[in-house]
Each structure stands twice: as C-alpha cells, then as structure tokens.
C-alpha cells in the first residue's frame, strides 16, 4: 500500500482506530458524507494488534489515510496510553505506508455507550460494539474538526 492519496480531497476513504491494549475498534468513513460506519475490532496483546486481522480491513477498504484516536487526559495532557496510541499509528505507517492522522478521543467511549444503549439497550453494549462505535465517533469528530 502506498502513501499516495488515491482519491481527491473531499472524496477520500478513511479507516479509524480506537486504540486499546486488548482490543482496537475499527470503523470506515467517507469524506464526502462526513460520516462513518463501525466495522468491528481487532484483538491486541498489550497494544500490539494481530496485524493480519488489521491488514484485512486495510486491504478491503483501501483507505486514503487513517485516523487513530488519542486518549488524552481530560485536561488535554498526555498519558502512557496516549504515547502507546502514537506508537501504534507510527507502526501502521511504517508497516503499510499509509498516512496516519491523530484525533482527540476524549469521551468517545462514553458517547459510544450512550448511543449504543439508546439504539439497542444493554444487549447492544458488547465490547466489540463499543470499540467499533468509538472508532466511528473518532472519524466523525476528525471530519467535523477538519471541514467545519
């Protein structure tokens, strides 16, 4: 996969990741609509993803770039998980050659849980759903920040 953007700005496809030490949520978004769809999650061991599973999403969706959520403290300062998420993004870029952007993800998990519960009650609050929904919110907040 190459770092060259395949699509014109405004028409690009983006994959978003909600980084976690055990699971990494995945979503896909389209710049044209400013919206994203949750896809699922990839298992990780101490923040290192099962790369083959992650690669399947990249191969299927052929993203023009990737957005990784940055788990900042509420005051905006970094924590160890923030540094781990940056390392994850840098590894993706090094491994697949795809441009990586970072997006503040404060409160996305709480928002994801609230939205999932509203749509399906407690049965909708599965870990996989929460991680993927968080990735969707990360992409959409990136679009809002960039294009509004």
From Swiss-Prot:
* Classification via InterPro entries: RNaseH-like_sf, YqgF, YqgF/RNaseH-like_dom, YqgF/RNaseH-like_dom_sf
Where is it localised? Cytoplasm
What is the protein's name according to its record? Putative pre-16S rRNA nuclease
HAMAP family from the entry? Answer: Nuclease_YqgF
Q: Which family does it belong to?
A: Belongs to the YqgF nuclease family.
What are the protein's UniProt keywords?
A: Cytoplasm, Hydrolase, Nuclease, Ribosome biogenesis
**What Gene Ontology terms for biological process does this UniProt record contain?**
rRNA 5'-end processing
What this protein is reported to do is described as: Could be a nuclease involved in processing of the 5'-end of pre-16S rRNA.
What CDD domains does the database record attribute to this sequence?
YqgF
Upper taxonomic lineage: Bacteria, Pseudomonadati, Pseudomonadota, Gammaproteobacteria, Alteromonadales
- Source domain of life is Bacteria
Q: Which EC numbers characterise this protein's activity in its record?
A: 3.1.-.-
An example Pfam family from this entry, by short name, is RuvX
Q: Which GO terms describe its cellular component?
A: cytosol
Natural source organism: Colwellia psychrerythraea (strain 34H / ATCC BAA-681)
Which Gene Ontology molecular-function terms are recorded?
nuclease activity
């Amino acid at each position: 996969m190459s770092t060259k953007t395949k699509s014109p700005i405004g028409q690009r496809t983006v994959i978003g990741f909600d980084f976690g030490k055990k699971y990494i949520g995945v979503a896909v978004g389209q710049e044209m609509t400013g919206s994203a769809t949750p896809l699922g999650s990839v298992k990780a061991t101490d923040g290192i993803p099962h790369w083959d599973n992650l690669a399947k999403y990249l191969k299927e969706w052929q993203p023009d770039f990737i957005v990784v959520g940055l788990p900042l403290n509420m005051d905006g300062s970094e924590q160890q998980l923030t540094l781990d998420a940056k390392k994850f993004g840098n590894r993706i870029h090094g491994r697949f050659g795809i441009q990586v952007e970072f997006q503040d993800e404060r409160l996305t998990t709480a928002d994801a849980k609230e939205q999932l519960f509203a749509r399906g009650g407690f049965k909708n609050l599965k870990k996989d759903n929460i991680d993927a929904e968080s990735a969707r919110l990360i992409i959409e907040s990136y679009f809002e920040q960039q294009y509004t």
